[in-house]
């Protein structure tokens, strides 16, 4: 009889431990689910801040070595984009449109633009809406519109679309790829 009582005691203890384990596991799963839900809510409401960094500045006082002309490029939704345009020879050289990344301003790209000085190329770099003092807020559709506006501006100057090179850096790569299709 004593052995039976010991086995019953062990059985009840294991059953109680199993119940406690299941309860703790359920609590842990619920906590993890709740934290995951909070993360999703945070990402939803702060996604713009995570994607676009127009005020970040790692400008290192580079001096621009190429002659640029500051231009204003109108968009179809009445935003004027700041651009820097360098023209060597529209007839003999292709024109590169530089779509920059998700952080900083035009000044942050001076070191890259200086590499173009020895190339037989014209170029235009634009600042996205919300960047470099431009009005508006960056959105995916807005960036596509900015890119189309840059192309249209060059076409109005008499540049054939076949003579355009779309160059994207980081975020600008998506825009360049979209517009190249």
What are the residue ranges of the model-derived segments?
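Glycine-centered tight beta-turn/hairpin loop motif at sheet-sheet or coil-to-beta transitions
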Residues: 76-78
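Membrane-embedded segments
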Residues: 80-153
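Aromatic pocket-lining residues of Rossmann-like dinucleotide-binding sites
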Residues: 179-180
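Alpha-helical transmembrane segments
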Residues: 6-10, 14
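Alpha/beta-hydrolase fold nucleophile elbow
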Residues: 159-169
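An N-terminal hydrophobic leader/cap segment in hydrolases
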Residues: 35-72
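N-terminal Sec-pathway targeting helices
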Residues: 14-34
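Gly/Ala-rich beta-loop-alpha elbow adjacent to hydrolase catalytic centers
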Residues: 168-172, 176
């Amino acid at each position: 009889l004593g052995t039976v009582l010991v086995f019953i005691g062990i059985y009840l203890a294991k059953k109680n431990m199993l119940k406690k384990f299941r309860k703790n596991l359920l609590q842990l799963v619920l906590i993890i689910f709740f934290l995951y839900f909070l993360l999703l809510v945070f990402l939803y409401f702060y996604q713009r801040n995570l994607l676009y960094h127009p005020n970040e500045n790692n400008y290192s006082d580079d001096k621009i070595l190429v002659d640029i002309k500051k231009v204003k490029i109108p968009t179809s939704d009445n935003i004027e984009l700041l651009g820097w345009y360098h023209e060597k020879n529209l007839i003999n050289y292709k024109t590169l449109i530089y779509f920059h990344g998700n952080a900083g301003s035009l000044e942050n790209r001076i070191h890259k633009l200086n590499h173009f000085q020895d190339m037989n190329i014209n170029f235009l770099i634009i600042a996205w809406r919300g960047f470099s003092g431009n009005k508006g807020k960056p959105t995916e559709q807005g960036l596509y519109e900015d890119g189309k506006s840059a192309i249209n501006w060059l076409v109005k100057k008499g540049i054939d679309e076949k003579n355009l090179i779309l160059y994207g850096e980081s975020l600008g790569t998506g825009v360049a790829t979209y517009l190249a299709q």
